[in-house]
UniProtKB/Swiss-Prot annotation:
GO terms for molecular function: DNA binding; DNA-binding transcription factor activity. It comes from Methanocaldococcus jannaschii (strain ATCC 43067 / DSM 2661 / JAL-1 / JCM 10045 / NBRC 100440). Belongs to the Tfx family. Keywords: DNA-binding, Transcription, Transcription regulation. Putative transcriptional regulator. SUPFAM superfamilies: DNA-binding protein Tfx (SSF89915). This is Putative transcriptional regulatory protein MJ0173. Pfam families: Sigma70_r4 (PF04545), TFX_C (PF14601).
Amino acid sequence: MVEDSFLTDTQIKVLKLRKKGLTQEEIAKMLGTSRANISMIEKRAKENIKKAYNTIKIYNRIMAPLSIEIEEGTDVLEIPDIVFKKADEEGIKVKYNTLELIELIKENASEFIEKRTVKKKFKIYILENGDLDVGGS
């Protein structure tokens, strides 16, 4: 049933049942195992998902045609103009407008920002499809 995935058939089944609202105890009874075993299966599934996500993130950063280092002291409100200018120079249309970009930065780079100022430099990766990835230097 599993095509090519980091998840086992059992992990997929457990995640689907949990999404439907079943408890670990209910799933354990259905599958003829212990609640502790279901807990471990679910935990390992989530770990595998996180590793897969991080692998894709690393790959995207390697393949990104453009990365911009946002320097310490930069006003957050200046960042969209920096990003749009660099993307335009490379012929890449960014998928975000100014407000969406500021929100993305706020969500993904909050540890680098204090009030409206960058306190520690970070990078913004611009992917070929116009998507962005925000992360450490």
